[in-house]
């Protein structure tokens, strides 16, 4: 389940991007009751993008920003409690790691759901049911 963390250069002190990625990933698993799950944990993957300020925008103007975006099966983030809790925690993680300098108003968190049956791992297309079975049996 890919996490894409996009930050304007300087939002986090150099080196804290990796810490943020790890904490955001751990929080996602925690909010879904899957911390330490042997099937899903290795499939938390992703990338960190640190961009110069002239390449990030808010209100159509250059601005320092943070974007936390997950691509997940449609059963993830389905509960309102999980949505609210994770978004609050993810925002706090970025804000805290910025030394409380980056405003929460410029931290965006969103989730994109994959089409059922189009979740590909190792060349195999899995359905939500298959993913759920794998997670439950781990």
Residue map of PLM features:
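A domain-level signal for the structural core that forms small-molecule/cofactor-binding pockets
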Residues: 1-138
């Amino acid at each position: 389940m890919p996490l894409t963390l996009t930050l304007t250069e300087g939002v986090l002190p150099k080196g804290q991007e990796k810490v943020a990625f790890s904490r955001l990933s751990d929080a996602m698993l925690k909010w879904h009751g899957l911390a330490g799950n042997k099937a899903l944990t290795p499939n938390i993957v992703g990338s960190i993008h640190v961009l110069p300020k002239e390449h990030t925008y808010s209100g159509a103007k250059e601005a320092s920003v943070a974007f936390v975006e997950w691509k997940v099966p449609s059963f993830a983030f389905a509960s309102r409690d999980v949505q609210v809790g994770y978004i609050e925690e993810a925002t706090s993680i970025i804000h805290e790691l910025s030394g409380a300098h980056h405003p929460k108003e410029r931290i965006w968190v969103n989730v994109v759901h994959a089409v059922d049956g189009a979740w590909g791992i190792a060349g195999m297309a899995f359905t939500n049911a298959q993913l759920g079975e794998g997670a439950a049996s781990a």
